[in-house]
UniProtKB/Swiss-Prot annotation:
This is D-aminoacyl-tRNA deacylase. InterPro entries: Daa-tRNA_deacyls_DTD, DTD-like_sf. Keywords: Cytoplasm, Hydrolase, RNA-binding, tRNA-binding. Belongs to the DTD family. The keyword Membrane does not apply. A motif (Gly-cisPro motif, important for rejection of L-amino acids) lies at residues 138-139. The lineage of its organism: Bacteria, Pseudomonadati, Pseudomonadota, Betaproteobacteria, Neisseriales.
């Protein structure tokens, strides 16, 4: 399971001109799920995201987490995070989980992250063509991969 974490001052996702989720200061999470992902991947990512110290403290040092600062999170499913460009120039998405596998895992990820943060995590619309707008803060962008925890 892969998550691209972006620290934002605000973010929103719309589908067909309708806003499905929006946040103020916090983290935009682009979430990609692979065929072999499962509950253990979710647990690791939820702990890491909720406790990741990427928000400034009073001294301007990145020393606070989403939990510490009461920040918000917006989760958007994105199968293209599992693109492979090993052969040719057209990305292959064969490692990305099909909807019947990825949707329940995405929903569980959102539920567990909501519980960890103590607030609802808004989302995009699973499988839809979405427009994501954001204002990067920093910018701070962190790549998390449950199969390669660095």
């Amino acid at each position: 399971m892969r998550v691209l974490v972006q620290r934002v001052s605000q973010a929103a996702v719309t589908v067909d001109g309708q806003t499905s989720g929006e946040i103020g200061a916090g983290a935009l999470l682009l979430v990609g799920i692979e065929e072999s992902d499962g509950p253990d991947d979710i647990g690791w990512l939820v702990r890491k995201i909720s406790q990741l110290r990427i928000f400034n403290d009073e001294a301007g040092v990145m020393n606070r987490s989403l939990i510490d600062c009461g920040g918000e999170a917006l989760a958007v499913s994105q199968f293209t995070l599992h693109a492979s460009v090993k052969k040719g120039n057209r990305p292959s998405y064969s490692r990305a989980a099909r909807g019947e596998i990825s949707r329940p895992l995405f929903d569980r990820f959102v539920a567990e992250l909501s519980a960890a943060l103590g607030k609802t995590v808004p989302t995009g619309v699973f499988g839809a063509d979405m427009r994501v707008s954001l204002v990067n803060d920093g910018p701070v962008t962190i790549w998390l991969d449950s199969r390669n925890p660095e």
